[in-house]
Amino acid sequence: NSVHPCCDPVKCEPREGEHCISGPCCRNCKFLNAGTICKRAMLDGLHDYCTGVTSDCPRNRYNH
């Protein structure tokens, strides 16, 4: 079994100095910059963007 390079296998959390393990707003163990598109617009015409502080891709706050 290979260990994920971002993951501390004992604690099951990001290694010291790293931000994240995986997710649409995580790349190379770091959060993507705020404003990076993490989900392209579909029917509503609004993209979803990374916040720079989480690996999740939050829904565009202007979506109804």
From Swiss-Prot:
Its main location: secreted. Expressed by the venom gland. SMART domains: DISIN. Keywords: Cell adhesion impairing toxin, Disulfide bond, Secreted, Toxin. Pfam families: Disintegrin. It comes from the Eukaryota. GO terms for molecular function: toxin activity. SUPFAM superfamilies: Blood coagulation inhibitor (disintegrin) (SSF57552). PROSITE patterns: DISINTEGRIN_1, DISINTEGRIN_2. Residues 1-64 form the Disintegrin domain. One of its GO terms (cellular component) is extracellular region. Disulfide bonds join C6-C29, C20-C26, C25-C50, C38-C57. Coiled coil: none annotated. Inhibits adhesion of cells expressing alpha-4/beta-1 (ITGA4/ITGB1) and alpha-4/beta-7 (ITGA4/ITGB7) integrins to the natural ligands vascular cell adhesion molecule 1 (VCAM-1) and mucosal addressin cell adhesion molecule 1 (MADCAM-1). Heterodimer; disulfide-linked. Belongs to the disintegrin family. Dimeric disintegrin subfamily. This is Disintegrin. The lineage of its organism: Eukaryota, Metazoa, Chordata, Craniata, Vertebrata.
